[in-house]
Regions:
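Beta-hairpin "wing" of winged helix-turn-helix
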Residues: 1-11, 212
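Alpha-helical "hinge/linker" immediately C-terminal to small N-terminal DNA-binding modules
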Residues: 7-37
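Central regulatory/effector-binding core of bacterial HTH transcription factors
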Residues: 40-103, 261-262
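Hydrophobic hinge/microswitch elements
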Residues: 78-82, 87-90, 97, 151-153, ...
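Beta-alpha-beta core module
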Residues: 105-114, 118-119, 184-230
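Flexible hinge/capping segments at coil-to-helix
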Residues: 107-150
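Secondary-structure junction motif
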Residues: 130-134, 141-166, 241-245, 249-259
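C-terminal effector-binding regulatory domain of bacterial HTH transcription factors
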Residues: 165, 197-206, 216-266
Length: 266
């Protein structure tokens, strides 16, 4: 050991600025690499509330072995908000509903769209209301209904394709954007509702909601579509997306089986 304190040499003092710049560059590169690594781990999905509440989590639970090292971010919203998130690359994958007359127009050079399966908007009510609804003559009493607003996709389908074409008279009891709120409101008897089958599988299975099996209350078919960005990241995740689509189809088809078992003829 020496009694003299260490001191930078003249050469080191001259290079101090260059050394500091080099260290700053190294830190920046390290930070960018870490951020890029984290981004590669995340699969961000946008979906309608009705899809993100029940069927998508069920499907994700079946492909966990493929998700090792990946984190799922599930963003819920209405159809237009989800599509905007996809096109601004806030998410890389979108799951949505379509019908033959209500399709999502996509830029095909940026987005790949595939059909996953079909879902159904089915008429349901609480067990206590089933007998009342069975005795309502078309065009007579007002039937209380719980539904979506008309300015969102599912609301448009219910109001334009089902209520407007029905021989029954309806009175709006409650309106909600969230499928879960409509499920709860219908379950406690605020009114009947048309709800996505995939969202109410458990309620039908356990008798908390009853399917209204009548020509006066038709079923409306929906196509479940998957939209994914044409990026290198999504190319690497193609097997994950394909597996998710397969399991989502199985999940929704399981709900069809529950519907068949729950039919109560009016």
């Amino acid at each position: 050991r020496t009694g003299r304190p260490a001191a930078p040499t003249p050469v080191l003092l001259e290079m101090a600025g260059d050394i500091e710049s080099a260290l700053t560059s190294i830190k920046r590169v390290s930070r960018d690499l870490k951020r890029g690594y984290k981004e590669n781990e995340v699969l961000a999905i946008a979906a309608l509330h009705s899809l993100s509440s029940v069927p998508i989590p069920k499907a994700i639970s079946k492909i966990q072995s493929l998700l090792s090292g990946h984190q799922i971010q599930l963003r819920s919203g209405n159809q237009s908000a989800c599509f905007q998130r996809l096109m601004t690359e806030e998410v890389s994958l979108m799951l949505a509903y379509e019908t033959p007359v209500n399709t999502l127009e996509i830029p095909k050079d940026l987005v790949i769209k595939t059909q996953v399966t079909n879902d159904l908007l089915v008429p349901v009510c609480s067990p206590q209301q089933l007998e009342y609804i069975s005795n309502v003559t078309p065009g007579s009493d007002q039937i209380q209904i719980v539904t979506y607003p008309e300015n969102i996709f599912l609301g448009q389908q219910v109001h334009q394709e089902l209520i407007a074409k029905s021989s029954h008279n309806f009175t709006q009891k409650l309106r909600a954007e969230m499928t879960s709120a409509i499920v709860s409101s219908t379950q406690v008897g605020l009114g009947m509702a048309w709800l996505p089958l995939s969202s109410i599988e458990d309620e039908l299975k356990h008798g908390l909601l009853k399917f209204i099996d009548s020509p006066c209350f038709p079923i409306h078919e929906l196509t479940v579509s998957m939209l994914r960005l044409r990026t290198k990241k999504m190319e690497k995740l193609a097997s994950v997306c394909n597996a998710l689509a397969v399991e989502l189809e199985k999940t929704i088809q399981d709900a069809y089986k529950v519907l068949e078992r729950s039919r109560v003829k009016l």
